[in-house]
C-alpha cells in the first residue's frame, strides 16, 4: 500500500495499480481472511468516514481518467454521506486532500488506462465510485 493511506480504501488504490499493470483479480471463495479490530477499538465513525472520503479524493486524483475524475469528485461525496448516515466532515476531507496535494513528495497522477477501465466494467464494477 502507498504510505499516504493510513486507513480507508487503501485496497482500492492498490487494486487500480494491479489492474492497470495488466493483472486480473480473481475471487476464490475457499480463501478466507479475517480483518481484526484493535482491542482499543476504532476511532469515532465521523473521523473514520472523513478519512475515507479524503482518501477517495486522493485515489480519484491519482488513478481516475477524465471525465471520471470530475464525476467521481462530485458524485462520491453524497454517495458516501448517504451510506455513512451523514457521519463525515466534507470540509475536513477537502482540507486533508488539499494538504496532500501540496506535498512535494506525493505520488504523481497516473490515471488508469482504457484497458483497466474496460476490465473494471467487465467485472461489473463502475469507474466513478
Positions of PLM-derived features:
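Short, well-ordered coil loops that connect the C-terminus of an alpha-helix to the N-terminus
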Residues: 1, 65-66
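A short, conserved alpha-helix in the catalytic core of glycosyltransferases
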Residues: 1-32
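Nucleotide-sugar-dependent glycosyltransferase catalytic core
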Residues: 6, 23-24, 31-54
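Conserved beta-strand termini and adjacent loop/short-helix elements that scaffold enzyme active sites
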Residues: 28-30, 36, 109, 113
